[in-house]
């Protein structure tokens, strides 16, 4: 990890995606900065915030890959969470002050009751964003108001719960907890979901633990920890990066010959016998390289986000042989 002396390192152009298993107690930005330091990268960005309380899948983008980070922000996410019934807190999670404690009636956690609440919160739902969140109001994050003791009116937001499973687990001796397995759209707050589930059960609840197990088809089994990344020799760390196109697996793939690739990189539309498609990953044939993303309408391929010629050259020049970083390859 970066030493306390903040030793200056020589930065370099790095292009790719690090599939990180974010550790507990670090913010997403802290995890990003540690990985950026370990890779000596010039430019980096993450693909969606995980609270310090949360662990799990956090794709980190470097260099040219940052141009496609929004695609992961918009992707569905899967989580495993633990909610403790009978206790509500000021933040909706274990870090807040206890607001209320109540005895939990076993009937409130009966299988048929859990099934009914599970159905209630599956599909399109409405959520009130928590005050302790990074959502902005008048240019300031809501949590800055909350820390000052100010509660603001917030508009409810529409989100989609694609899949939800509720079950009971033993969290501690003589303490029953609710395990929440959920796949949801962007913008869904799992803390709020845990609170709302507790309210629907009639006993209240707060979020005790949270782990993201999938982000846009990237599973936790493919991720690497910061500790394992740091343990690798510096020369081998770059081999743990996925190429920028790893963020584009759901895009239609189109490959252009050299002439059309050059024109596309200049921002010119190209015509071909392609079906309409809202999201297209565009590659050059010679040399084989990602050019950018676009969309197809009426047989016309239109550029949306392009790599620069320098970025493409750097990616081609630095492509290392993939090494065993302790993660599973996608097949």
UniProtKB/Swiss-Prot annotation:
The active site is at residue 51. Keywords: Isomerase, tRNA processing. Transmembrane segments: none annotated. CDD domains: PseudoU_synth_EcTruB. It catalyses: uridine(55) in tRNA = pseudouridine(55) in tRNA. Gene3D superfamilies: Pseudouridine synthase (3.30.2350.10). Its EC number is 5.4.99.25. It is an enzyme of class 5 (isomerase). One of its GO terms (biological process) is tRNA pseudouridine synthesis. One of its GO terms (molecular function) is RNA binding. Disulfide bonds: none annotated. It comes from the Bacteria. Responsible for synthesis of pseudouridine from uracil-55 in the psi GC loop of transfer RNAs. PANTHER family: PSEUDOURIDYLATE SYNTHASE TRUB1, TRNA-PSEUDOURIDINE SYNTHASE. Belongs to the pseudouridine synthase TruB family. Type 1 subfamily. This is tRNA pseudouridine synthase B. The lineage of its organism: Bacteria, Pseudomonadati, Pseudomonadota, Betaproteobacteria, Burkholderiales.
């Amino acid at each position: 990890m970066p030493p306390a002396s903040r030793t200056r390192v020589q930065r370099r152009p790095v292009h790719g995606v690090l599939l990180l298993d974010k550790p507990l107690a670090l913010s997403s930005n802290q995890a990003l900065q540690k990985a950026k330091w370990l890779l000596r990268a010039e430019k980096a960005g993450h693909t969606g915030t995980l609270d310090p309380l949360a662990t799990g899948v956090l794709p980190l983008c470097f260099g040219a890959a940052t141009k496609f980070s929004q695609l992961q922000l918009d992707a569905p996410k899967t989580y495993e969470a633990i909610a403790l019934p009978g206790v509500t807190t000021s933040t909706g999670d274990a870090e807040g002050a206890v607001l209320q404690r109540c005895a939990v009636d076993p009937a409130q956690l009966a299988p048929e009751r859990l099934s009914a609440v599970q159905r209630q919160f599956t599909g399109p739902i409405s959520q009130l964003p928590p005050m302790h969140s990074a959502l902005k109001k008048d240019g300031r994050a809501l949590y800055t108001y909350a820390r000052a003791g100010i509660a603001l009116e917030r508009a409810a937001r529409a989100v989609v719960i694609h899949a939800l499973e509720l079950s009971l687990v033993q969290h501690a001796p003589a303490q029953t907890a609710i395990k929440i397995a959920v796949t949801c759209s962007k913008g869904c707050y799992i803390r709020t979901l845990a609170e709302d589930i507790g309210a629907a059960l009639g006993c209240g609840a707060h979020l005790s633990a949270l782990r993201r197990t999938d982000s846009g088809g990237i599973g936790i089994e493919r991720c690497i920890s910061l500790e394992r990344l740091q343990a690798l020799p510096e020369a081998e760390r770059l081999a743990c990066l996925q190429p920028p196109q790893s963020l584009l697996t759901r895009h239609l793939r189109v490959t252009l010959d050299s002439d059309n690739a050059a024109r596309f990189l200049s921002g010119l539309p190209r015509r071909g016998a392609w079906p309409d498609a809202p999201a297209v990953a565009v590659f050059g044939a010679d040399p084989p390289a990602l050019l950018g993303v676009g969309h197809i309408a009426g047989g016309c391929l239109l550029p949306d986000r392009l790599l620069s010629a320098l970025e493409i050259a750097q990616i081609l020049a630095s492509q290392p042989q993939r090494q065993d970083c302790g993660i599973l390859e996608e097949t």
